[in-house]
Amino acid sequence: MRVAVGAAFFLSSADGVRIMATAVWDDDTTGRKDGFWASGHVPTLIAAFLYFDLAFMVWVLLGPLAPDIARSLALTPAEKGLMVAVPTLAGALLRLVNGLLVDRIGPKRSGTISQLIVIGGLASAWMMGVNSFGATLALGVILGFAGASFAIALPLASRWYPPEHQGKAMGLAGMGNSGTVLAALFAPTLAKLFGWNAVLGLACIPLTLVLIAYQIMAKDAPGAPPAKSLGAYFTPLKTADAWWLMGFYAVTFGGFVGLAASLPIYFTDRFGLSTITAGYCTAACVFAGSLVRPMGGALADRVGGVKALTAVFIVAAVALAGVGGASSVEAALALFVLAMLALGTGNGAVFQLVPQRFSAEIGVMTGLVGMAGGFGGFYLASSLGLAKQLTGSFSSGFLIFAALAIVALVGLMLVKGHWRRTWTAAAGVRI
């Protein structure tokens, strides 16, 4: 016999498949908790990863294509920076919308709507052409729907898993950040073979295939909270904890996605690399950050999100400050990999903390925190382009963002004691 802690419950289907809502399950005779893979719904976790992965691939698609687009449209450094930053800003704003949709119509339907919009936008851009700077910005807004997938994929996966496995579940689903690797690896080569505009149409093929798999595999978790009034969704913003978590994610995820979008431009402009070589360098950096995201969640489960973030902010600040003075592509690449390892770990660590404090508002908090991360990415990507145009160098942009990581570290030191005293963590969960 199983006993549910809280309001969650088990369902057993005719074929014996066990379905679990977001809860801690204890065996009332042994006190044992289910292992990670047995405690949730693995097909949904896989579907969330695939959906997130391909969405992130197209979200940053303008980054690897930026050198080719800039040459074709004669863009300035500031315009290049803004072009790759707009999808990040649009994604930030749309994440809040998706967070609201998730709690009202469920993550599966929300994801379907968002993916159809992205596929339609890319197909239209491919057929009609992108012939001006304004058109690139309009396309960037459409690609923002792909970035907003964050607020869908994570609740889709996390609602199936108990508190002690939240870091792993959200880390594995969030490993869809690796989609940025696919964009960096393949977009420049495809652009060389077929032209950069054709890449927009080619991207629709894997998006459609994954959407089909998503429809088959993904299931909304039972026992989802009832829809609240619109005003109730913004209740978390009345608490300082929400703003702190948003600020921390603006640094970790903002740094990750801002670099993913900007590094192709950096490597081509700073060191004169070809677009394909710059894509390989970017892919190496992004892969490092994506790989450690689930490890960051698992690390936070083990030692606590606060300790994990402390190390993250220190390493990220040192690495990004070092990039400002890097004189060779090898040194810059090594420092970017180090920075991305730290930032990827931080992404997982922040989302280990979010459900511990806001379990009842996980949908909207995912949207709010993700929105803040998008704002951070927009700032980094746009400021790097502006710094290049005004000073002739990217260095000041990296130094300012390194300083923001130090500010986040100071903030974390200020709130960690209060969090540990006042948050009520589930048994076995560290803060």
Show which residues each predicted segment covers.
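Cytoplasmic helix-loop-helix junction between adjacent transmembrane helices
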Residues: 139-176
